[in-house]
Structures are given as structure tokens and as C-alpha cells.
UniProtKB/Swiss-Prot annotation:
Record protein name field: Cysteine--tRNA ligase
Gene: cysS
Cofactor: how bound: Binds 1 zinc ion per subunit.
EC number: 6.1.1.16
This protein's GO CC annotations: cytosol
Catalytic activity: tRNA(Cys) + L-cysteine + ATP = L-cysteinyl-tRNA(Cys) + AMP + diphosphate
CDD domains reported in the protein's UniProt record: CysRS_core
Pfam families membership: CysS_C, DALR_2, tRNA-synt_1e
'HIGH' region, short sequence motif: residues: 29-39
Superkingdom of origin organism: Bacteria
Subunit structure: Monomer.
Length: 464
């Protein structure tokens, strides 16, 4: 597998630090509002990358943080006359709801800044001891002139950055590019005690400290949206490598912008849509399909026309799946023909081709193209005369490859809800001593391959 490394600006063979294991960190949201679908693209990409790595046999530990204390959170809390904690906790819950609608699974660890302040303080102390940071009136700054490799991720040298800097004048700083590690407390704002007085962490230090705590001094993959290359990820490298003396991350992955009218979608430009707004008109699996239909590094212009096209493409895949399910349910052909055995053997070509294109810098667009090639082949070959084994093989390959991308999961979710609804109806019928209806529901589910088990903990179900 090769991945494009932002640090080297080239594709590199992926070799994890520990064979068979991957440690991956992606910068998560600042939780002061609902995230927009530009953020959603990044969440979808890292979710799909994680799924693919697991599919390829890696044991993945994925960490995605929540920035739950920040100027924007404090401002929102003041506007609503509530605590910053109330705002952040509310939007963490909403994040999980919206992420789930996009098919994004929870990370293995979702650390919060406010729960890791002691580790952040200890990290800052190490930087002070190494003389790469300095304290001024309760604020602590990182001295970028003390880190020789500053600018290596964004491919800019210090002189260029300083001459082009549009940074507000701060006489307390030694250099215009120096950035804050610890902010002294302001009246009415959340704060923590530290060796430099009461205050709170700066943005960049949070991820360095949490990545080190949960994944170690060097991690395999780090990334996020393309807008984080500079200054956020550049500053993370400076902090972490100055602190440990080791490479911070071996592979840096950045997701291209989602644009509206060729301008980056952002809250500051007020040109964004949230998943909730898109969900008023579209199934959000179509949005996931849309995001994965382009290479993750390519900037994508969002439009309803393109989303309609994605919706149609996804419907083709669902139609193929439903067609196979229908044949499987109705076919009486048990014995395989010799030609079917050969065709089943040929299906491995699709998984091999899927792996080949996906291994080339996680090319989900080409991966989806392979899936459509499979569907065309299936539609030609699988008819009502096909044997059960041939249909099962085709179905298994389709579900396997789409599952890697987190697609075609709707039936599973709908099935869970439908079974739950029928179990409740059966329970109500039993309470009302309507045993005829109760038995009818049980028999109906049995016909669908669902077996109910009455246990002391309630009714449980399983597929036959």
C-alpha cells in the first residue's frame, strides 16, 4: 500500500512502526456548533481509511480528539448565558448523531482537551526546560526560531513565513510566528491552575499532548483537513519533535477542500451546509457516496446536480443488491454448473483489482469503479437460472467491497428497526393475550430467517 505523504510530497510505501498495527490520529472538531459537510468529508475519509486498513488485516487504533475549550466555545456560552462545558457537551452529542448519519463510526478513543490538561501542562514544562518555549506574564509561547525544521510540512522557510505573515502584533512575542501554548486566565472564562498561573491551553499543544499520551511519541498516520497543514500541523510537529527528539508522525494525510462556487466551504464565509440540512432533501448515504466518488486529495465542488448523480449511482448498487437477494430467495437451483464454478473463481479478480487501486493512495474513486464493473458482470451472468452458490458468491463479493467503504448498510439498519418494531408488537399482543397475532408475528419473522428467543432478559433475535 502506498500513501501520499504531505511531508515528502510523494507517494510512499506504507510501513507501520509495528508490523500489523496502525496508530492513527485525526484532528477532530471544535465543538461549538454543528459541523458542516466540508468537515464531514474529512470525517468520512478517515473513517473509510480506517475501515480499509482493518479490511487489509491491520489492527488499527484510531484517535480523534474533541477541542472542548476554545474562544468560539466561550463566545457561544456567553451568548446563551450557559457554561462552556454545557455548550461542548451538547455539541459532542450532536457530533456523534450527525457522524452516524454519514456512516462514520466512533473512533477507538475520543479524548477531550479538558480531561487532559495535566498532560498538556507537563508537555509545556518539557518545552520550557528544553528552552524552546518562554513565559511572559502568565502566557507561554513556543519560540519557532529554536526549531530548525519549522516549515518542513508546509514547505516554507522561516524567513518566507515571517515576511508573509499576517499576524496581529503582539509585543510580548519574540517572533511574529511564535504561537501560544498557554493563555493566562481572563475574568469569567474557564481556567486551570498551572506553574505560570491560572489559564488554559492553546490550540496547537492539545493535539501534541493527546497524541503522545494515547499513541506514543511517534505515530504512523496523522492528518485532517487540508486547511490544517499550516499552522496547526506545522506547529504540532515543532512541539512534538522538540519535546521528544523523535519523528512525530511518519505519514501525513490531508483531505482536499469541499468547495461551493470554487470557494472553500467554511463557517467564516457562511457558505456551508450541515448534514442536517442535506438530510431534508437527500438520504445521507448518498452524501457519503458522493464524497468517496472523488479522490480524497482532490478539491471537490459541491452541487445538488453532483449529489443527484451520486444518489443515482448508489441506487444502482442497491438495485444490484436487491436483485441478488430476490433471486436468492426464489431460486430452486441447488447444483452448480461447471461454468458457474469458473465464474465464481473469476470473482477474485474484482477483489484483487479493488485492493490494487485502493492500495494506490487510497483511491476510493477507482475502488467504486471496480464495484460497478462487478455489478455489470453480475447483471449479465446472474439470472433466475443461477444456482444458489453462484448468487451467494456474487452477493458476498458485492457486500464485502461496498462494506469496506461503509456503503449499502441501509438494509441492516432498517432490518434492526423493523425487527424491533415487530418484537414490540408481539409483546403487546401477548400482554393483551392475543396469542394468534403473537404467533403470526413469530411465524412471519421465521419465514424471513429471523429466530426469536424468549429469555429472562427479554426477547432476543438472531438470523438463521
Amino acid at each position: 500500500m502506498r500513501l501520499y505523504n504531505t511531508l515528502t510530497r510523494k507517494k510512499e510505501v506504507f510501513v507501520p512502526i509495528e508490523q500489523g498495527k496502525v496508530r492513527m490520529y485525526a484532528c477532530g472538531p471544535t465543538v461549538y456548533n454543528y459541523f458542516h459537510i466540508g468537515n464531514g468529508r474529512t470525517f468520512i475519509v478517515f473513517d473509510a481509511l480506517r475501515k480499509y486498513l482493518v479490511y487489509r488485516g491491520y489492527d488499527v487504533t484510531f484517535v480523534q480528539n474533541f477541542t472542548d475549550i476554545d474562544d468560539k466555545i466561550i463566545k457561544k456560552a456567553q451568548e446563551e448565558a450557559v457554561s462552556a462545558k454545557e455548550i461542548s457537551e451538547r455539541f459532542i452529542v450532536e457530533y456523534f448523531k450527525d457522524a452516524a448519519t454519514l456512516g462514520v463510526d466512533q473512533a477507538d478513543i475520543h479524548p477531550k482537551v479538558t480531561e487532559n490538561v495535566p498532560e498538556i501542562i507537563a508537555f509545556i514544562q518539557e518545552l520550557l526546560e528544553k528552552n524552546v518555549a518562554y513565559e511572559v506574564n502568565g502566557d507561554v509561547y513556543y519560540d519557532v526560531s529554536r526549531f530548525e525544521d519549522y516549515g518542513k510540512l508546509s514547505k516554507q522557510n522561516l524567513e518566507e513565513l515571517q515576511s508573509g505573515a499576517r499576524i496581529e502584533v503582539n509585543e510580548a512575542k519574540r517572533n511574529s510566528l511564535d504561537f501560544v501554548l498557554w493563555k493566562t486566565a481572563k475574568p469569567g472564562e474557564p481556567s486551570w491552575e498551572s506553574p505560570w498561573g491560572s489559564g488554559r491551553p492553546g490550540w496547537h499543544i492539545e493535539c501534541s499532548a493527546m497524541a503522545k499520551k494515547y499513541l506514543g511519541e511517534t505515530i504512523d498516520i496523522h492528518g485532517g483537513g487540508g486547511d490544517l497543514v499550516f499552522p496547526h500541523h506545522e506547529n504540532e510537529i515543532a512541539q512534538s519533535e522538540a519535546c521528544t527528539g523523535k519523528t512525530f508522525a511518519n505519514y501525513w494525510i490531508h483531505v482536499g477542500y469541499l468547495n461551493i462556487d470554487n470557494k472553500k466551504m467554511s463557517k467564516s464565509l457562511d457558505n456551508f451546509f450541515t448534514p442536517r440540512e442535506i438530510a431534508e432533501e437527500y438520504d445521507l448515504e448518498s452524501l457519503r457516496f458522493f464524497m468517496l466518488s472523488a479522490h480524497y486529495r482532490t478539491p471537490v465542488n459541491f452541487s445538488r446536480e453532483l449529489l443527484e448523480s451520486a444518489k443515482s449511482g448508489l441506487e444502482r448498487l442497491y438495485n444490484a443488491k436487491n436483485h441478488l437477494e430476490h433471486i436468492l430467495e426464489n431460486t430452486k437451483v441447488e447444483e452448480m454448473k461447471e461454468t458457474e464454478k469458473e465464474w465464481i473463481d473469476s470473482l477474485t479478480h474484482y477483489s484483487e483489482e479493488f485492493n490494487r487501486v485502493m492500495d494506490d493512495d487510497f483511491n476510493t474513486a477507482d475502488g467504486i469503479a471496480v464495484i460497478f464493473d462487478l455489478v455489470r458482470d453480475m447483471n449479465t451472468y446472474i439470472t433466475g437460472e443461477a444456482s444458489k452458490e453462484a448468487v451467494k458468491a456474487a452477493y458476498g463479493m458485492l457486500v464485502e467491497l461496498t462494506g469496506v467503504l461503509g456503503l449499502l448498510r441501509k438494509e441492516e439498519e432498517s432490518l434492526d428497526k423493523e425487527i424491533g418494531r415487530l418484537i414490540e408488537a408481539r409483546q403487546q399482543a401477548r400482554i393483551e393475550k392475543n396469542f394468534t397475532k403473537s404467533d403470526e408475528i413469530r411465524d412471519y419473522l421465521k419465514e424471513k430467517g429471523i429466530v426469536l428467543e424468549d429469555t429472562s432478559q427479554g426477547v432476543k433475535w438472531r438470523k438463521e
